[in-house]
Regions:
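Nucleotide-activated chemistry modules centered on ATP-dependent adenylation/adenylyltransferase
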Residues: 1-209
């Protein structure tokens, strides 16, 4: 969430700035100063990449058909359709980070279809992976993270022939190189520092994982 979506007039604009580390530190300082240290502000998810969160989340299948992160489904007027529209960048990104760590039939069962096997989604995935345009104005992960996850799928027989994976493989390797993508993929699974999380909570989370 700390990576911006676009630069404008020399300034970075971040669609999800309120989830960023910079915002977390600033609001924590304000609250601490206003309450004499009585209130703390921190994110329990800060140490983990989106891909790592997906890896942890997929351990429990009981949530498969009740969870959603599709923005098109959250409307003031309500929504009674599918949990995932399958057309927005948010759906495309979530599908992408689950694909390297979840069985294909299970993931397709959650989304209703293989979002990586639809040529119409090519431009969206190019933007998510930094191969075209700009990062989508949605709550999606970092560009290199998406690129690394897509690269991981090029080495999986069950995913390698999907339309998007096979089409973007050469461009991914040209832009980033296999060494950079391999390193990024490994780094995604390494938990970051827990400096802003109270020690007791950090210890309990580490034990649970």
């Amino acid at each position: 969430a700390s990576e911006g979506n676009i630069s404008f007039c020399g300034r970075e604009a971040n669609h999800q700035y309120s989830k960023s580390l910079d915002f977390e530190v600033r609001i924590a300082d304000v609250l601490a100063a206003a309450t004499g240290g009585a209130l703390q502000y921190f994110s329990l998810l800060r140490p983990y990449s989106e891909a790592r969160i997906a890896q942890i989340f997929m351990r429990e299948a009981r949530f498969d058909h009740v969870f959603s992160s599709c923005n098109r489904n959250f409307r003031l007027a309500g929504h009674d359709g599918p949990l995932w529209c399958g057309e927005c960048p948010k759906c495309h990104f979530v599908f992408l980070i689950f694909a390297p760590v979840m069985a294909q039939d299970r993931l397709v069962g959650i989304f209703g279809r293989n979002l990586l096997d639809d040529p119409a989604h090519e431009h969206s995935y190019r933007e998510l992976t930094g191969l075209a345009g700009q990062k989508p104005w949605e709550c999606v992960g970092e560009i290199l993270e998406a690129a690394a996850c897509l690269y991981a799928l090029t080495r999986r027989p069950e995913w390698a022939e999907s339309a998007i994976v096979s089409k973007l493989k050469a461009d991914l390797l040209t832009q980033y190189g296999s060494e950079k993508l391999e390193a990024a993929l490994a780094e995604l699974m390494v938990d970051g520092p827990t400096d802003h999380i109270p020690a007791e909570l950090a210890e309990r989370i580490a034990h649970a994982l």
